[in-house]
Swiss-Prot record:
This is ATP-dependent RNA helicase mak-5. ATP-binding RNA helicase involved in the biogenesis of 60S ribosomal subunits and is required for the normal formation of 25S and 5.8S rRNAs. It is found in: Nucleus, Nucleolus. The keyword Ion transport does not apply. A motif (Q motif) lies at residues 209-237. The lineage of its organism: Eukaryota, Fungi, Dikarya, Ascomycota, Pezizomycotina. Residues 1-10 have a biased composition (Basic residues). Residues 240-463 form the Helicase ATP-binding domain. It comes from the Eukaryota. Residues 510-666 form the Helicase C-terminal domain. CDD domains: DEADc_DDX24 (cd17946), SF2_C_DEAD (cd18787). ATP binds at A253, S254, T255, G256, S257, G258, K259, T260. A motif (DEAD box) lies at residues 372-375. The gene is mak-5. It comes from Neurospora crassa (strain ATCC 24698 / 74-OR23-1A / CBS 708.71 / DSM 1257 / FGSC 987).
Length: 805
């Protein structure tokens, strides 16, 4: 009996309808098709290619499989099925029958009957009803047989019924317990839903009267009021009227002065007016309104966030998208099809434009071309893609007739047509250029600031030469209006600058001392190389400081994650109350508006004076105050003197006119900071241990990568890899040999030695630094001040950097 039951259970699923019939059948099948019958499509050649080397008239096909059967090649293409083929594909699933039961084993007569009824149904559609009745008979017989088999076992249905009654009783008891009548009628309603009905707290009214002279729409002024900007900045009050009047503008203002809204407000105002006109005339959208280029990805993301925040208060807002590296190209192409304002970096923008003619066609009709941090974008030897973008936007669209003329025609006719085409292209180009406003903004347009501080050149460019340089790089439709918000000073007004003189090998020590003297101020540390960022970040982390890296070698998601953590001041509460620290290269030097950055430290002297201006501009933004400190070694003394002379050039002229010497200039621009040598000496042991640990970890990581690379190279060349022979051959006594030897020693450090170093550093960090206070006698101490600084690093009174006075 057990065997029969097993057979019955195994055959039960076979009698039911198959699951695959519930899935919709495909309406297309692939069949062999001749080459001429395929749906070929013409390949669009990018307009940027002046010479396609004869590859004209190319066609492509998709969705075709190539099958090779011996020497015969077949093209299998998708062909729609006919209605008859779709009907024959299988019977439609009509649901499960209530009385359907599995077939009993060995019932051959019933199987014959069902097969006969199926054959009759297939051959004679008129007998469908009869066939269905014949199909029901074996089902009834199956049911009777099943009941007969179950008659000896009468206890089974009784047990099932009793079990069901018990479950019903349990459910009823459970419902009685859960349904409790509320004693208070007010509790019957959900009070949390009423919170949505409560009126929002009224915000304080802001006086926006100073925005009225700029001739902005009421909805724009209302949107600005929601951002809590009561009055425009100097660059905004000067640049917005000129842009609204339709002029090309070159705007110069110090860092943190609101340059983004200076060009963002007119661009959005133009889109709003154009959208209303299209709505009234029932016209379709022709393309994007503005293209905004920025040198870095982080700045592009920030511009997008600022403009989106401005558009939140508008009833209808433009669609703003960012096109930058590190993100999916296909998604960006889809966004460009509907984008009204495009914010991009030159590299990714050129990649998309050069591969898709539709993107280039939509951007040719833009009303605004904006260059933020234009001096960086237009710098010689940088961002060649930006120049290609300008040329592509100025080039008139290529027509099909012109392409046909390129492929055929006599020489004389070709020359005449080329002359006519060149004249027409010049006229079209002039008309095309005149439609677009060009806006460029930056904090530094002086070419003198772009020169390397370590060089020997003494070239000094005048303001007229700077303007000529910009006019040569860009095709303005008119002489641009030059708006200078700070003609005298390059730096922000509320910025305090300091200079710390130290040894070349003591920069790590003085960096740590500076951060410890300002523990509650969020700091941004700038270096000149990616390797320095990779070395300093673990060094500061070993010293229990929340440090985050940012450099060009990181993927885009890691960059954004570091910036978000720094903005959120993540880890400050866990790491002895110290504020967050961002260690970055010049990637973070331009445009980034990170709130509450109080301290900027230049670990290396910048390569150019403009880099110092933009680095220091990350603090003291708007009306806030900030501090910029430069760590200078003996080898960097000459570049530092040149830096001071170039950055404070206007102050030098004023000092010369008043009879002062240049030495007073240094004291007025950069104040020398003297840190207590006793504090530095007591911090030295901590820094040395942290440096050894960081160098050992980095050497082990880099050593493993180098070995893997050498092994792979040896395998590719078919050479045996012997690390000892390579080490002997690679030994030399020249420049860099001592550094290589130190890396090797750090790489050979064992885990036990590394653990002992960590334990020693942990012990030092758990103690507070005594600054000359007697721990035995408290008579000479201010106990209240001591209790206030209980969680501080120093035991006793410590003077700060001395820049606040």
């Amino acid at each position: 009996m057990a065997v029969d039951k097993k057979r019955k259970n195994t055959k039960a699923p076979a009698s039911g309808p198959k699951r695959r019939k519930t899935q919709p059948s495909s309406k297309q099948i692939k069949r062999p098709v001749s080459v001429d019958a395929l749906a070929w499509k013409t390949v669009d050649i990018p307009e940027m290619f002046d010479d396609a080397e004869g590859f004209f008239g190319l066609e492509e096909i998709t969705g075709v499989d190539i099958v090779k059967d011996g020497d015969v090649v077949k093209f299998m293409a998708a062909v729609p099925k006919s209605e008859a083929e779709v009907e024959d594909d299988g019977e439609e699933f009509g649901g499960f029958d209530d009385e359907e039961t599995p077939k009993p084993a060995g019932n051959a007569d019933q199987e014959v009957k069902t097969s006969e009824t199926k054959a009759e149904a297939a051959s004679t559609p008129a007998k469908e009803k009869k066939a269905s009745k014949d199909q029901r008979k074996p089902k009834e017989q199956q049911k009777q047989q099943k009941q007969q088999k179950q008659q000896p076992k009468k206890e089974q249905p009784n047990k099932a019924a009793n079990k069901k009654n018990a479950e019903d009783k349990k459910k009823a008891r459970k419902n009685e317990k859960t349904t409790v009548e509320p004693k208070d009628p007010e509790l019957e309603t959900d009070l949390f839903t009423k919170l949505e009905e409560l009126p929002e707290p009224e915000e304080e009214e802001i006086d926006m009267s100073e925005w009225v002279p700029l001739d902005l729409s009421p909805r724009m002024i209302s949107s600005i009021a929601k951002l809590r900007f009561s009055k425009p900045t100097v660059i905004q009050s000067k640049a917005i009227p000129e842009i609204m009047a339709g002029h090309d503008v070159i705007g110069k203002a110090s860092t943190g002065s609101g340059k983004t809204l200076a060009f963002g407000i007119p661009v959005i105002e133009s889109w709003l007016s154009a959208a209303e006109t299209r709505k009234q005339n029932k016209e379709e959208r022709k393309g994007a309104t503005a293209l905004i280029l920025s040198p870095t990805r982080e700045l592009a993301q920030q511009i997008r966030d600022h403009l989106q925040a401005l558009c939140k208060g508008l009833p209808t807002a433009p669609y703003i998208c960012s096109v930058l590296g590190g993100m999916a190209v296909q998604k960006q192409k889809r966004q460009l099809q509907v984008a009204d304002i495009v914010i991009a970096t030159p590299g990714r923008m050129w990649e998309v434009m050069s591969s898709d003619n539709s993107v280039l066609a939509s951007l040719r009709n833009i009303s605004f071309l904006v260059l933020d941090e234009a001096d960086r974008l237009l710098k010689d030897g940088h961002f060649k893609e930006a120049e290609e973008i300008f040329k592509a936007l100025d080039r008139p669209p290529v027509e099909e007739n012109n392409e046909d003329q390129k492929m055929g025609g006599t020489d004389e006719e070709g020359q005449e047509e080329e002359e006519e085409d060149s004249e027409e292209e010049e006229e079209e180009e002039e008309e095309h250029v005149n439609k677009r406003q060009t806006l460029i903004f930056s904090a530094t347009f002086n070419k003198n600031l772009q020169q390397k501080l370590a060089g020997k050149s003494k070239f000094k460019a005048t303001s007229t030469q700077d303007m000529e340089y910009l006019l040569q790089k860009l095709n303005f439709r008119e002489t641009p209006k030059f708006v200078d918000a700070n003609p005298v000073h390059q730096m922000a007004e509320n910025l305090k600058e300091g200079l710390i003189m130290c040894g070349d090998m003591e920069k790590d020590l003085y960096l740590y001392a500076t951060l410890m003297l300002q523990p509650t101020r969020r700091a941004l540390v700038f270096t000149n190389s990616v390797n320095s960022v990779r070395r300093l970040t673990p060094l500061l982390e070993n010293l229990n400081l929340p440090a985050f890296p940012l450099h060009s070698g990181m993927i885009q998601q890691a960059r954004l994650r570091s910036i978000d953590r720094f903005k959120a001041n993540e880890g400050a509460k866990k790491k002895n109350g110290s504020a967050a620290i961002l260690v970055a290269t010049d990637v973070a030097a331009r445009g980034l508006d990170i709130p509450d950055v109080d301290l900027v430290i230049h670990y290396h002297v910048p390569r150019a004076a403009e880099d110092y201006v933009h680095r220091s501009g990350r603090t003291a933004r708007a009306s806030n105050s900030g501090t910029s400190i430069l760590l200078c070694g003996p080898k960097e003394a000459v570049p530092t003197q040149r830096l001071v002379a170039k950055v404070h050039a206007q102050a030098e002229v004023k000092a010369g006119n008043s009879g002062n010497n240049t030495k007073k200039l240094v004291s007025s621009g950069l104040r020398t900071i003297d840190i207590d040598r006793r504090i530095v000496a007591k911090l030295r042991e901590r820094v040395d241990l942290a440096k050894k640990i960081a160098d050992a970890v980095q050497a082990k990581t880099m050593g493993g990568k180098e070995d893997d690379w050498m092994k792979k190279a040896a395998e590719d060349l078919g050479v045996d890899y012997d690390s000892e022979e390579l080490e002997k051959a690679g030994k030399w006594g020249g420049k860099g040999s001592s550094k290589k030897q130190k890396q090797k020693e750090a790489q050979q450090m064992s885990k036990g030695e590394l653990a002992s170093l960590r334990a020693a550093l942990r012990d030092l960090l758990s103690k507070r630094i005594n600054t000359g206070v007697s721990e035995r006698y408290l008579t000479g101490l201010d106990v209240s001040e001591l209790l206030k600084g209980e969680q501080g690093l120093f035991l006793g009174q410590v003077d700060g950097l001395g820049l606040d006075d």
